[in-house]
């Protein structure tokens, strides 16, 4: 399925929120081919890929990254030039109650994928072996908490994960770097800030608030809502990830952020203001969307602030986000308003 001179990229977790954006970007904006490997858990949705599903440069394999035999089959069958590893359990709240799933997928699954990639890479012709890339996509949560400082996370910030989720991703990051250092597997790591955009599973803050507001349900905000996050539009992130896997330097780490620091309460209030404009006909009994905001008990171990310094990827690879938080959030709200069936399924 590979076009002459173009890459064949294996994307794990390609039916997820960020993964599907990456797959769409590659198929719609490059001449590369994609093999989408996804287990299709609750958060995976092939509807996100209907626009490109019939493209001859796209293939889908329903495979668990913990299934080594199936991984070996996929590598042998499709012979990828690069791996973009996004398959992961990613919701912090779920990790608090079901940490074992996160250990299995995020740590053991990454190990199995690394070993399958290494076995495949070692038997490649020398010129192909040198060009091969293993790009591991991670989170800024591995760095811990910036509470009480004006600092930003850089690529050299020490790891200090606070939750079972971030600890599992930190472990995966360390495995990838160890395989690069020990076995010379050509690897790159990127760490991103909070993603948002159309098609996101509604357990995450922004889609949950949009969908609850449109249904007249409470808008639950942890604690006092003062926690700060940096927000990155998912399509900007997809462009960055493609640049990293095609242009990034082996052994390097790239932080990817939107320079959009907002408190959680600011985000929810901005969503409410957009809905007042774009969906003025409210559910019965709702005078203002903001009236639905409800403060709830804070999450255990809730980090106060994340903020990413994306200067390195801007300087070295020339990447810049195209969306402001305001423009990206408007597109996101409008998508949920325009996709009522998706809202009902969510």
Swiss-Prot record:
<comment type="function">
    <text>Catalyzes the dehydration of dTDP-D-glucose to form dTDP-6-deoxy-D-xylo-4-hexulose via a three-step process involving oxidation, dehydration and reduction.</text>
</comment>
<comment type="pathway">
    <text>Carbohydrate biosynthesis; dTDP-L-rhamnose biosynthesis.</text>
</comment>
<feature type="binding site">
    <location>
        <position position="229"/>
    </location>
    <ligand>
        <name>substrate</name>
    </ligand>
</feature>
<feature type="binding site">
    <location>
        <begin position="64"/>
        <end position="65"/>
    </location>
    <ligand>
        <name>NAD(+)</name>
    </ligand>
</feature>
<dbReference type="InterPro" id="IPR036291">
    <property type="entry name" value="NAD(P)-bd_dom_sf"/>
</dbReference>
<feature type="binding site">
    <location>
        <position position="264"/>
    </location>
    <ligand>
        <name>substrate</name>
    </ligand>
</feature>
<dbReference type="InterPro" id="IPR016040">
    <property type="entry name" value="NAD(P)-bd_dom"/>
</dbReference>
<keyword id="KW-0448">Lipopolysaccharide biosynthesis</keyword>
<feature type="binding site">
    <location>
        <position position="195"/>
    </location>
    <ligand>
        <name>NAD(+)</name>
    </ligand>
</feature>
<comment type="subunit">
    <text>Homodimer.</text>
</comment>
<comment type="pathway">
    <text>Bacterial outer membrane biogenesis; LPS O-antigen biosynthesis.</text>
</comment>
<dbReference type="GO" id="GO:0008460">
    <property type="term" value="F:dTDP-glucose 4,6-dehydratase activity"/>
</dbReference>
<keyword id="KW-0520">NAD</keyword>
<feature type="binding site">
    <location>
        <begin position="298"/>
        <end position="302"/>
    </location>
    <ligand>
        <name>substrate</name>
    </ligand>
</feature>
<dbReference type="GO" id="GO:0009243">
    <property type="term" value="P:O antigen biosynthetic process"/>
</dbReference>
<feature type="binding site">
    <location>
        <begin position="38"/>
        <end position="41"/>
    </location>
    <ligand>
        <name>NAD(+)</name>
    </ligand>
</feature>
<feature type="binding site">
    <location>
        <begin position="17"/>
        <end position="18"/>
    </location>
    <ligand>
        <name>NAD(+)</name>
    </ligand>
</feature>
<comment type="similarity">
    <text>Belongs to the NAD(P)-dependent epimerase/dehydratase family. dTDP-glucose dehydratase subfamily.</text>
</comment>
<dbReference type="InterPro" id="IPR005888">
    <property type="entry name" value="dTDP_Gluc_deHydtase"/>
</dbReference>
<keyword id="KW-0456">Lyase</keyword>
<feature type="active site" description="Proton donor">
    <location>
        <position position="140"/>
    </location>
</feature>
<protein>
    <recommendedName>
        <fullName>dTDP-glucose 4,6-dehydratase</fullName>
        <ecNumber>4.2.1.46</ecNumber>
    </recommendedName>
</protein>
<feature type="binding site">
    <location>
        <begin position="165"/>
        <end position="169"/>
    </location>
    <ligand>
        <name>NAD(+)</name>
    </ligand>
</feature>
<feature type="binding site">
    <location>
        <position position="139"/>
    </location>
    <ligand>
        <name>substrate</name>
    </ligand>
</feature>
<dbReference type="GO" id="GO:0009103">
    <property type="term" value="P:lipopolysaccharide biosynthetic process"/>
</dbReference>
<dbReference type="GO" id="GO:0000271">
    <property type="term" value="P:polysaccharide biosynthetic process"/>
</dbReference>
<feature type="active site" description="Proton acceptor">
    <location>
        <position position="165"/>
    </location>
</feature>
<dbReference type="Pfam" id="PF16363">
    <property type="entry name" value="GDP_Man_Dehyd"/>
</dbReference>
<feature type="binding site">
    <location>
        <begin position="220"/>
        <end position="222"/>
    </location>
    <ligand>
        <name>substrate</name>
    </ligand>
</feature>
<feature type="binding site">
    <location>
        <position position="194"/>
    </location>
    <ligand>
        <name>substrate</name>
    </ligand>
</feature>
<feature type="binding site">
    <location>
        <begin position="86"/>
        <end position="90"/>
    </location>
    <ligand>
        <name>NAD(+)</name>
    </ligand>
</feature>
<feature type="binding site">
    <location>
        <begin position="204"/>
        <end position="205"/>
    </location>
    <ligand>
        <name>substrate</name>
    </ligand>
</feature>
<dbReference type="GO" id="GO:0019305">
    <property type="term" value="P:dTDP-rhamnose biosynthetic process"/>
</dbReference>
<feature type="active site" description="Proton acceptor">
    <location>
        <position position="141"/>
    </location>
</feature>
<feature type="binding site">
    <location>
        <position position="90"/>
    </location>
    <ligand>
        <name>substrate</name>
    </ligand>
</feature>
<feature type="binding site">
    <location>
        <position position="105"/>
    </location>
    <ligand>
        <name>NAD(+)</name>
    </ligand>
</feature>
């Amino acid at each position: 399925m590979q076009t002459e001179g173009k890459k064949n990229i294996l994307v794990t977790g390609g039916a997820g929120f960020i993964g599907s954006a990456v797959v769409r970007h590659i198929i719609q904006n490059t001449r590369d081919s994609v093999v989408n490997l996804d287990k299709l858990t609750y958060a995976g949705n092939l509807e996100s890929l209907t626009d490109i599903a019939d493209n001859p440069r796209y293939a889908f394999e329903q495979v668990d990254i913990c299934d080594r035999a199936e991984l070996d089959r996929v590598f042998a069958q499709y012979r990828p030039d690069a791996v973009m590893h996004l398959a992961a359990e990613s919701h912090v709240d779920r990790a608090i109650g079901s940490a074992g799933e996160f250990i299995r997928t995020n740590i053991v699954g990454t190990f199995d994928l690394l070993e399958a990639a290494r076995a495949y890479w070692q038997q490649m012709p020398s010129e192909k072996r040198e060009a091969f890339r293993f790009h591991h996509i991670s989170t800024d949560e591995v760095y811990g908490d910036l509470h009480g400082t004006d600092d930003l996370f850089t690529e050299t910030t020490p790891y200090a994960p606070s939750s079972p989720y971030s600890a599992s991703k930190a472990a995966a990051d360390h495995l990838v770097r160890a395989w690069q250092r020990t076995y010379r597997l050509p690897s790159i790591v990127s760490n991103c800030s909070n993603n948002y955009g159309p098609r996101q599973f509604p357990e995450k803050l922004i889609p949950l608030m949009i969908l609850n507001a449109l249904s007249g349900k409470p808008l639950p905000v942890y604690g006092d809502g003062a926690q700060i996050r940096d927000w990155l539009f998912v399509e900007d992130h997809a462009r960055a990830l493609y640049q990293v896997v095609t242009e990034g330097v082996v052994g390097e780490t790239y932080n990817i952020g939107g320079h959009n620091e907002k408190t959680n309460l600011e985000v929810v209030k901005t969503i409410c203001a957009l809905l007042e404009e774009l969906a003025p006909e409210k559910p019965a009994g709702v005078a203002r969307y903001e009236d639905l905001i409800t403060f709830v008990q804070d999450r255990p171990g809730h980090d106060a602030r994340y903020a990413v310094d994306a200067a390195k990827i801007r300087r070295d690879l020339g990447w810049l986000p195209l969306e402001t938080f305001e423009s990206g959030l408007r597109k996101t709200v409008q998508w949920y308003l325009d996709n009522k069936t998706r809202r009902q399924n969510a």
